[in-house]
Amino acid sequence: MQTMLGKPALQYFGKLSRYLYKNGEPINIWVYSRNSSFSVIPKNGLLSPKITQRFYQNSSIQYQKDKNIYEPKENLEEKELSEGFLDESRLEIPEAGHNWEKSFFGLSSQPFSKEICDLLTAPLEVDDIEIKPDGILYLPEIKYRRILNKAFGPGGWGLAPRGNTNVTSKSVSREYALVCHGRLVSVARGEQTYFDPEGIATASEGCKSNALMRCCKDLGVASELWDPRYIRVFKRENCVEVFVENVLTKKRRKLWRRKEDKFSYPYKEV
């Protein structure tokens, strides 16, 4: 939790973490920065007004009794995450530009040229498609970018943050807008899980990649991967599900792979 709360708050969060349930219901504590929010659920115990009051006084976080949430005071500076992850989404917008956090400029105004459409909706190469061990087909993110670069040209498209980064105890999510040739094309929320607070920055990049994949769906890029019939045919013709054994734990399970690939350490096929 030390990367989520400022040092003044940490001194009292240790006490607060012992107070989870109020009338048998879990208490969800929200800690807000100017542009990011963090959800923290203590481990066990009963919420104490005295503890929450001291927590409020020493962490610069305002407690609202009717909502059981904490919000920052208006006259205080943004809380840092141990001088780490900060979300600076409020950028200055040029006079001639558009604020893509709010603008829908160009959405559905006209279709792109036939040449661009042909590049975006071109069938995928079989060799480009990968499969995860759990059987999910996917296209590597770099290949989405190559398709967009081929269709719009490098610099002719971009992802604009739309809204704030939301960081919970297990995942990061943020909404992005795909802008092509100065027009809003699609809006999607990307999400990415993480297992350690040190990985929040990396998870935020994974969140952006996930949003790009979802935005490309509206342009018809890799649309086959959303078609159940195509997925079944591809897996039947190009993939195989086999039993593998973990050489360290000796546990066996069934995993998917492409027919021409082999599993690497610590797995071996049995």
From Swiss-Prot:
Pfam families: Mgm101p. InterPro entries: Mgm101 (IPR009446). This is Mitochondrial genome maintenance protein mgm101. Keywords: DNA damage, DNA repair, DNA-binding, Mitochondrion, Mitochondrion nucleoid, Transit peptide. It comes from Schizosaccharomyces pombe (strain 972 / ATCC 24843) (Fission yeast). Performs an essential function in the repair of oxidatively damaged mtDNA that is required for the maintenance of the mitochondrial genome. Binds to DNA. One of its GO terms (molecular function) is single-stranded DNA binding. GO terms for cellular component: mitochondrial chromosome; mitochondrial nucleoid; mitochondrion. PANTHER family: MITOCHONDRIAL GENOME MAINTENANCE PROTEIN MGM101 (PTHR31404:SF0). The lineage of its organism: Eukaryota, Fungi, Dikarya, Ascomycota, Taphrinomycotina. It is found in: Mitochondrion matrix, Mitochondrion nucleoid. Residues 1-35 form a transit peptide. Its main location: mitochondrion.
